[in-house]
Amino acid sequence: MKQRKIIHIDCDCFYAAIEMRDDPSLANRPLAVGGSADRRGVIATCNYEARAYGVRSAMSSRHALKLCPDLLIVKPRFEVYRSVSREIHGIFRQFTDLIEPLSLDEAYLDVSDSPHFAGSATRIAQEIRRRVAQELHITVSAGVAPNKFLAKIASDWRKPNGLFVITPDQVDEFVTALPVSKLHGVGKVTADKLTRLGIRTCLDLRDWNKLALVREFGSFGERLWRLAHGIDEREVKVDSRRQSLSVEHTYDQDLPDLQSCLEKLPALLEEMNGRLQRLDASYRPDKPFVKVKFHDFTQTTLEQAGASRDLDSYRQLLASAHARGDKPVRLLGVGVRLHDLRGRQEQLELFA
C-alpha cells in the first residue's frame, strides 16, 4: 500500500490572533473572544496569556472572569474570520486540492502526490506556515504524519507556532509512548475507565486483544485497538459536508433525573449557537435534536421537524427523550440538522 503524507494545520488561537493583529494594543494581555458574561456568554477562544490563568474555549465567560479578573472579552467578528480562512485555504490550494476543512481554523491536507519540494510533506508544511505568517500575520502549527490520527496529534505537539513530523519509521515508537488520553474520542470518562483497567499508554493498550476491548467499550474498542497500533485509514475527504452540528457532554457524575438534565441545557445551547455562527453561509439550520445516553450506555436521539431552536423547544425534546429511558443520564447532546444550500456537487471553498 502506498505510503500517505498527511498534514494537519491548526491556527494558533485563531480568533484572538486576528483581533491582536488588527489591534496591537490587545497584545500581551489576557484576551478572549466570546459572549458577554452578563448574558451567559461562552468563550470561543483565548490567547496564551489568558490560558495561563486556566481560561479555555467553551468555558462560560463568567467563570473565565473569575479565573482572570483582568480578562478582556471582545465580541467575535465572524465575517473577518471567514475572510482570513478563505485566504489560508487559497494558500493550501497552491500545494494540493485534497483538503478537508474541519473548522474555520483547522484542516487536513493530503500531499501524497504533490510535486512541490520534490514531494516533501515537511517542506510543504514549512512553506505553508511561512506564507501564512508573511501574508496574513498570524501563526499556524502543523503536524506531518502518515495518517490523519497522527497528523492531528503532531500539530499539537509543539504549539504554538510549531511543526512536528512523524515519519513512517517513527510511528511505532511514537505511538507506544502516547498517553491514551491523547487518542481521538477518549474523553475524561473513558480515560478514567482505562486508568482503572491499568491502561495509561498505548503500550498498555496493546496488551489487550481486540475482542477484550470490544467487550469493555463496545464498537469503540475496535477503534481503540487500531489507534494503539497507529492505524488510521480514513481518507482526506475533499467533499466532506456537514449533515448536522451538535454539542455533547459526558458528565463525571450521572444526572439523576430530568430536572438535573434540564439545568444543563442553557450551557449546551450557548456552545452550540456559538458553533453555528462559525459555519459558512452555505448551510441553513433545520431540525433541532437531542441525544441522551443513559448510565447503562443505552441511548436515544429525538428530533422534530418544524420546531424552533429556542430553549423551550429543546426542553420539550429533552423531556420526551428522557422519558424513553427514565434512568440516570451520563451524556447529553444538543444539535441541529443542516440543510446544504450549496449542493453536494460543489467543491467546498470555505472552512466549514
UniProtKB/Swiss-Prot annotation:
Cofactor comment text: Binds 2 magnesium ions per subunit.
Catalysed transformations (reactions): DNA(n) + a 2'-deoxyribonucleoside 5'-triphosphate = DNA(n+1) + diphosphate
Transmembrane annotation, as ranges: none
UniProt entry keywords in alphabetical sequence: Cytoplasm, DNA damage, DNA repair, DNA replication, DNA-binding, DNA-directed DNA polymerase, Magnesium, Metal-binding, Mutator protein, Nucleotidyltransferase, Transferase
Main location: cytoplasm
Cellular localization per UniProt: Cytoplasm
Residues bound to Mg(2+): 10, 105
Any one GO biological process: DNA-templated DNA replication
Keyword DNA repair: yes
Highest taxon of the lineage: Bacteria
Cofactor(s) needed: Mg(2+)
Record keyword Nucleotidyltransferase present: yes
Record-level GO cellular component terms: cytosol
EC number in record: 2.7.7.7
Active-site residues (renumbered): 106
Pfam families attached to this UniProt entry: IMS, IMS_C, IMS_HHH_1
Substrate discrimination, annotated site positions: 15
Chain ranges of the UmuC domain: 6-187
Record PROSITE patterns: UMUC
Single Gene Ontology MF annotation: damaged DNA binding
InterPro entries: DNA/RNA_pol_sf (IPR043502), DNA_pol_Y-fam_lit_finger_sf (IPR036775), DNA_pol_Y-fam_little_finger (IPR017961), DNA_polymerase-Y (IPR050116), DNApol_IV (IPR022880), IMS_HHH_1 (IPR053848), Rev_trsase/Diguanyl_cyclase (IPR043128), UmuC (IPR001126)
Family designation: Belongs to the DNA polymerase type-Y family.
Function: Poorly processive, error-prone DNA polymerase involved in untargeted mutagenesis. Copies undamaged DNA at stalled replication forks, which arise in vivo from mismatched or misaligned primer ends. These misaligned primers can be extended by PolIV. Exhibits no 3'-5' exonuclease (proofreading) activity. May be involved in translesional synthesis, in conjunction with the beta clamp from PolIII.
Database matches in PANTHER family: DNA POLYMERASE KAPPA (PTHR11076:SF33), DNA REPAIR POLYMERASE UMUC / TRANSFERASE FAMILY MEMBER (PTHR11076)
Subunit structure: Monomer.
Protein name: DNA polymerase IV
Organism, scientific name: Ectopseudomonas mendocina (strain ymp)
Gene that specifies this protein: dinB
